[in-house]
Each structure stands twice: as C-alpha cells, then as structure tokens.
C-alpha cells in the first residue's frame, strides 16, 4: 500500500518585503502551510502574507539564525521548506518537490540549486552557480546555528539528497539595494569576527585579510572559475564581492581599535 502524501510547510522570515512577497508566495501557494515570522514591517508585508493564507507571527529580530528557528518551530507539517522572501520556486522545482513528497523520500534533507539574479542577469559562473542550499527537510530534522551572521546554514548530520531544478533568487535589482545589504551584512560579520578575536590587529593578518584575500578571491572566481562569462554584470559582481570581503575585515579591525 503506497504511503500517504507528505504535508509541507513553508518557513519564512520577513521585514518590509512587500516588493518580493507576492512573487515568492505565489510559487508556494500549493503548500499545506505557510509560516511568516515578521520582525516589524512598516509596509504591506503582513497584509500580503495573510492574503496568501499565511500564518503571520511577530518576533523581534535577534539574528537571522534565531529568527528562522522561530519559524521552523511554528511549522506543523511532515516536511519543511525554508525560503527567503526574495526566492521563488520554478514550476519544475514545484513539481519535483510534489513528486518527492508523494512517496517516501529516500533522505531526510535535500539540497536545492539556487540561481541568482544580479542587476537583471542570471549568474551561472564564478562559483555562484549552482548555489546549493539545504532548505528542504523533515520537520525537526535540522536547525540553524545562531549567532553566526546572516548566512547561517541549517545543521543536519545525516546523508542528504539533491534536487535538480532551480530555486530563483531575485537578489539585487539595484546597486543601492546591493550596497545596503552588503553594508549591513559586513557589519554583522565584523562583529562576529571581533568577538572571535579575528580582528586583524597584527600587520600580517591585516594585509592578508583586508588586502590579499579579497584580491585572491577575485582572481580565483573571475578568471579560474569563469566568472567573466557572465559579462559586465559578472565583473561588477566579483569586484563588489571582493569589496565586501574587504569591508568586513576593515570593520572588524576598526572594532578592535574601539573606533566602530
């Protein structure tokens, strides 16, 4: 006798995401449950989420990992898909997930390839694709590390499967949005580096972390990993990614000097 279809919850966090949310929620409207943990949006985020039948909860922001764990704890379905407000499931990925959950999945957690949009171009080279994310797992099988910055990955100790179709990341439509994110994220990472004593106070550490490392990352990703095949947008992305690395170590160094 075939096993019954597994139910699916969508776990999301949000803050002023009215521009992204309709597109994202439309791609998961078919899920059994949508949970959105909001940290104090001033726009129509809550109204939009509820129009898609989402359960919305306010929780003061305490870090990305902490906030996402709150969302995971509120999910009640057999399986959970952790989704950012600017990510969209392609039709092919939706069908792949539905097919997977219609039977008994072989693994308890699955990687999903993510395709990133940068200034209107889909980035397919330079180490940015396939940008695999561990997002689909049995309820309770994974949690995010807390206090490790904005890019915490769900922690899961067992074998993991891989899905084949893309999740689309509508990341940075404008330079202003990109710079705002990178400024905020680099400050968050810098505070963590400072707490760990990695604030580059010695001259060799400073030169490596703030100068040589960003340069090496650019050369490796842009040339050796073929980032140049993504055109001008790829060049801008890899320059800015190296600048982001520079920023986080400069900010950590400044914190170590008591100047930030």
Question: Where are the language model's segments positioned?
Answer:
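Short, well-formed alpha-helical segments that are part of the catalytic scaffolds
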Residues: 12-33
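A conserved acidic beta->alpha catalytic loop
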Residues: 27, 38-47, 84
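Short aromatic/hydrophobic "clamp" motif used to bind/position activated sugar donors
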Residues: 80
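Acidic helix N-cap motif at the loop->helix transition within catalytic regions
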Residues: 22, 43-52, 92-93
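Short, structured coil segments at secondary-structure junctions
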Residues: 30, 52-53, 132, 156
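Catalytic-site signature of metal-activated, phosphate-bearing donor transferases
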Residues: 66-72, 90-259
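Conserved donor nucleotide-binding strand/loop of the catalytic core
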Residues: 46-74
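Cell-envelope/extracellular polymer assembly enzymes that use nucleotide-activated donors
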Residues: 7-9
């Amino acid at each position: 006798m075939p096993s019954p279809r597994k139910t699916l919850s969508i776990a999301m966090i949000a803050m002023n995401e009215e521009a992204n949310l309709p597109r994202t929620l439309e791609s998961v409207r078919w899920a059994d449950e949508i949970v959105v943990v909001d940290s104090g949006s001033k726009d129509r985020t809550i109204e939009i989420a509820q129009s898609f039948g989402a359960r919305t909860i306010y929780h003061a922001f305490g870090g990305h990992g902490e906030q996402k764990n709150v969302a995971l704890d509120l999910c009640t379905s057999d399986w959970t898909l952790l989704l950012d407000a600017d990510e969209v499931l392609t039709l092919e990925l939706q069908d792949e997930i539905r097919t997977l959950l219609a039977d008994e999945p072989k693994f308890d957690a699955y990687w999903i390839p993510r395709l990133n949009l940068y200034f209107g171009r889909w980035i397919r080279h330079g180490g940015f694709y396939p940008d695999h994310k561990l997002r689909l797992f049995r309820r309770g099988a994974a949690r995010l590390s807390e206090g490790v910055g904005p890019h915490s990955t769900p922690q899961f100790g067992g074998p993991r499967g891989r899905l084949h179709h893309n999740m689309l990341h509508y990341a940075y439509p404008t330079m202003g949005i990109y710079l705002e994110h990178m400024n905020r994220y680099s400050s968050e990472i810098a505070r963590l580096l400072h707490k760990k004593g990695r604030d580059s106070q010695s001259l060799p550490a400073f030169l490596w972390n703030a100068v040589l490392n960003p340069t090496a990352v650019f050369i490796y990703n842009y040339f050796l990993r073929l980032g140049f095949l993504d055109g001008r947008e790829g060049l801008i992305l890899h320059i800015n990614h190296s600048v982001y690395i520079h920023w986080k170590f400069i900010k950590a160094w400044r914190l170590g000097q008591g100047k930030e």
